[in-house]
Amino acid sequence: MFKAAINAELLKDAIASLAVIVDEVRFKIKPEGISVKAVDPANVAMGIFELGSSAFEEYSADECEIGIDLNKITDLLGIADRNDTVRMELDEGSNKLLIDVGGLSYTLSLLDPSTIRAEPRVPQLELPAKVVLNGADLRRAVKAAEKISDHMLMGVSGDTFYMEAKGDTDQVRLEMGRDQLIDLKAGEACSLFSLDYLTDIVKPTNKVNEVTLSLGRDFPILIDFEIANGAGRISYLLAPRIESD
Amino acid sequence: MFKAAINAELLKDAIASLAVIVDEVRFKIKPEGISVKAVDPANVAMGIFELGSSAFEEYSADECEIGIDLNKITDLLGIADRNDTVRMELDEGSNKLLIDVGGLSYTLSLLDPSTIRAEPRVPQLELPAKVVLNGADLRRAVKAAEKISDHMLMGVSGDTFYMEAKGDTDQVRLEMGRDQLIDLKAGEACSLFSLDYLTDIVKPTNKVNEVTLSLGRDFPILIDFEIANGAGRISYLLAPRIESD
Amino acid sequence: MFKAAINAELLKDAIASLAVIVDEVRFKIKPEGISVKAVDPANVAMGIFELGSSAFEEYSADECEIGIDLNKITDLLGIADRNDTVRMELDEGSNKLLIDVGGLSYTLSLLDPSTIRAEPRVPQLELPAKVVLNGADLRRAVKAAEKISDHMLMGVSGDTFYMEAKGDTDQVRLEMGRDQLIDLKAGEACSLFSLDYLTDIVKPTNKVNEVTLSLGRDFPILIDFEIANGAGRISYLLAPRIESD
């Protein structure tokens, strides 16, 4: 059993944060909320998604797992007004999700969860440095780096967080000191990341006040922020690239 | 003789409602206004257009017929500001239309009406059901249906008007009861229509308060609404598709 | 030595006015400001650009010449907010320009000026007619002409300035009398210009109050207006086309 109602804009944003990683996902539904863990097809980026029941206007659920094509949901939500309420109900017999938005009733066939890549194990990482910054600052640095290169260095040096991209001839660097950051835990950290992935991942951060980055030396980065006004959370784990120079 | 002046925005909207059916049309000009009847090249959709002289700021005309390339007019009106006045005068000797918009004088060669498909005969149909609804509701249902399928069922069942589209696995349905509609004349009606055509036809309805649909059982649909603040009217007649299941 | 700070929007607009002519330019830097003279690869249009030191928030420079790829600068400025200050400093040793925008530090490799086409000689022309008009009027006429043809006649006849484009069947003409113009110096003038070039050149004039056109009979046109709130000036010299009819 699963029956829920949620604001359309809020669901759209939550789905968008997942869709940057994968197209088809297993939603793990529990009485306390919905969670997803997924890796991208190339095994470079992982998304860990949690949306608590308090994000919903109505929510009642037994434990179950459903398979969703995120593109279809995104498409359907494109019709909704931002203040519409989206009502969902699982029809277990037919394996369909009934979705009602502003008078329109959708009957969405679900995917068989067993055909979707299994939930990955989240590695336990010791990431010594932590940086909390405004999402718009992060996005701006990534956009600037894209103009120059296809990868970007991120690190902490003393009390300064930095992002740097080098092209064949040009270079861009952003440095933020402790006073420009929301929080900083100093630690040895410097890793190189693919901008292909970073660009997608930071897209939803533009409206986010606090994004937490956890970093190490040639280690994955953990990019982490609240969604749904604090009722949910998305974390991305992105593998580093090996520096070739 | 034909000489007229009209608000640019109003003319743009009127032309746009015709352009969804055909590119080249015969304008029938009379002292009381302008009318067009045209079918699309595939004989699936017909447009019946009327723009009374009261839609114009100035209007004086003898009976005549001119051939117009709607794409050219649309292009030229693209330069106009929405509050500009468009002045038109027919130069019968040279078969040109002189158009003046905000100081720019266009000389537009007219098409020979005899090279344009003749005005079609409008079939007399007995369409038992009639639905009056808000144009934005109609457009929204058609946009939702497009996500799912390339055709759409429209019908009346008891006191309910419904639109439904079925894809290979998914389905969308909008039901509107008598109290959600502006008016309803119940009657047996259920026909299937191509979304290729419906999408174009409902595009101009977004700003229209009242759209009248006349429906029957496997019969054409008549989609009908006012243009030019009531000084004109456009009706579309769209042939049904045969249901294949 | 070259060190300067300038409003991002102002620099963006100034660069855009140059970029319609060429991609790579030699900036001539002097204590009193920056100047550029460049011709397009086909030798049809010339741009003469001047940006005085008063356009800058800070400015100090010795005489020097640097080679710039305008596309790169445009790209970088795309990240800036309109009220950001852009700080630039020349690093002569490495032949790089250090650019700082809102905390982001770019290191931009400069081009070797000797690899860029030398500054052209500006021909001394006797252009008998002069027209001063609003930039938006000019742009509107050019946009209308594009719908009809790929070249455009511009001239002065008595006290009237006119622009005219003829297509195979259609024609558009704008006439502006002395009272609709900001200023007019009558003189024999009528020349034909390629709309490919005019379209680009008039793009920046949309926000410009006064554009001065200097014209002759089958002569180049000089299109001239202030940039940077009067602290700079851009002039375009466009060669005429030979009328083929």
UniProtKB/Swiss-Prot annotation, chains A, B, C:
Residues spanning the membrane: none
Keywords: DNA replication, DNA-binding
Coiled coil spans: none
Keyword hit for DNA-binding: yes
HAMAP family: DNApol_clamp_arch
Quaternary data: Homotrimer. The subunits circularize to form a toroid; DNA passes through its center. Replication factor C (RFC) is required to load the toroid on the DNA.
Similarity comment: family membership: Belongs to the PCNA family.
Protein name as annotated: DNA polymerase sliding clamp
Protein's organism: Methanosarcina mazei (strain ATCC BAA-159 / DSM 3647 / Goe1 / Go1 / JCM 11833 / OCM 88) (Methanosarcina frisia)
